[in-house]
């Protein structure tokens, strides 16, 4: 009897080992927190200038956690899934949407030869700008001057990622509105049609990428705001020179013109052109120094703004790092871009919410130092 029990235990363990070899699920995450100082903030009434200290989560990178899994189906085919949600390390609360998996929730099939097809919620394709931003679209970066447009996540997505062939790969997305209106979602919904295509070429010396994408207004299906519902054209390049990485990019946000939401004004900006450049110096295996300049120009009297920033990271281990960033944004007389990716509109307290945009023509300056751990 004892021998039978032993053989049964061995058989069960062997079966578990085979199942483990065929499929896997990985828990991963990142916690980011630090102390931030910012000057040039508006008063509650939108005038004047003030400053503050605060603990902040996500300045260097979004705090997040997730699950991803793969099942080997044989013949080079795999079933894959990913679930990912954001949260605040400072408060423990969920991301801004309040959803558990507000960043990613998808499932699909992958093939070593033919690529990967996914269905579900995903990072909008414009997040591909990240690879060409010296500060990785952190809080004070290219995202600030397009007011967070390139941080978007889209639901009801169908995407395809090709394998890399001779240095080239392509990626495409199509997000359904899930409505009888082809472009717009149901009334009150947060989903309009989205789509985009991306082509990348990579070798040991350089990398280049081009992206075209659309984000439609969920209420009317129009392209009616350069920062929330527009077409974007992007081209970026990375140059790898030993310990140095040189990065540069250009984006153009375009609407269909007419009345721009949410301002309701025919004279609000209908275009935004942004360019940036920067250098990362890998001083040691653990320490990196970064410097970058970002500039945006809008039409219809919306003005222009420039962010100057330096920073760096020091890796205490493969999973833990210290980070620091110093930045300032300079606005022309009619522009009011902040260091953070704030919504459009005047700064100050409006409808119970505080908008950090400075007074038009004023600047903001900030310093951030924090710690980040990945698992």
Regions found by a protein language model. Give the residues of each.
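Outer membrane beta-barrel
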Residues: 22-37, 52-179, 191-193, 200-204, ...
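Outer-membrane beta-barrel "beta-signal"
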Residues: 316, 359-375
């Amino acid at each position: 009897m004892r021998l039978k029990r032993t053989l049964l235990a061995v058989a069960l363990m062997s079966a578990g080992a085979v199942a483990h070899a065929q499929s896997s699920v990985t828990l991963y995450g990142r916690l980011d927190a630090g102390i931030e100082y910012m000057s040039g903030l508006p008063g509650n009434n939108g005038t004047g200038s003030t400053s503050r200290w605060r603990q902040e989560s996500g300045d260097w990178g979004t705090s997040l956690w997730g699950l991803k899994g793969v099942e080997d189906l044989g013949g080079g085919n795999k079933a894959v899934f990913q679930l990912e949600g954001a949260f605040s390390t400072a408060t423990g609360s969920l991301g801004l949407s309040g959803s558990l998996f507000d960043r990613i929730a998808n499932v699909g099939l992958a093939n070593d030869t033919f690529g990967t097809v996914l269905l579900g919620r995903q990072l909008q394709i414009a997040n591909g700008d990240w690879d060409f931003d010296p500060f990785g679209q952190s809080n004070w970066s290219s995202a600030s001057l397009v007011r967070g447009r390139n941080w978007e996540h889209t639901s009801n997505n169908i995407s395809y990622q090709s394998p890399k062939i001779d240095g080239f790969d392509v990626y495409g997305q199509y997000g359904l509105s899930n409505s009888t209106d082809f472009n717009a979602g149901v009334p009150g919904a947060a989903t309009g049609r989205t789509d985009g295509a991306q082509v990348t070429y990579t070798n040991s010396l350089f990398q280049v990428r081009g992206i075209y994408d659309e984000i439609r207004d969920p209420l009317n299906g129009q392209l009616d705001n350069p920062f929330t519902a527009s077409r974007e054209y992007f081209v970026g390049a990375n140059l790898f020179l030993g310990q140095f990485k040189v990065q540069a990019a250009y984006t153009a946000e375009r609407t269909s013109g007419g009345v721009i939401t949410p301002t309701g004004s025919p004279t609000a900006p209908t275009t935004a052109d942004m360019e940036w450049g920067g250098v990362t110096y890998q001083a040691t295996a653990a320490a990196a120094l970064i410097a970058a300049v970002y500039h945006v120009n809008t039409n219809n009297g919306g003005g222009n703004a420039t962010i100057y920033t330096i920073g760096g990271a020091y890796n205490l281990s493969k999973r833990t790092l210290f980070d620091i960033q110093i930045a300032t944004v300079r606005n022309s007389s009619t522009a009011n871009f902040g260091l953070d990716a704030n919504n459009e509109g005047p700064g100050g307290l409006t409808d119970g919410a505080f908008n950090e945009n400075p007074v038009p023509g004023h600047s903001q300056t900030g310093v951030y130092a924090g710690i980040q751990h990945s698992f």
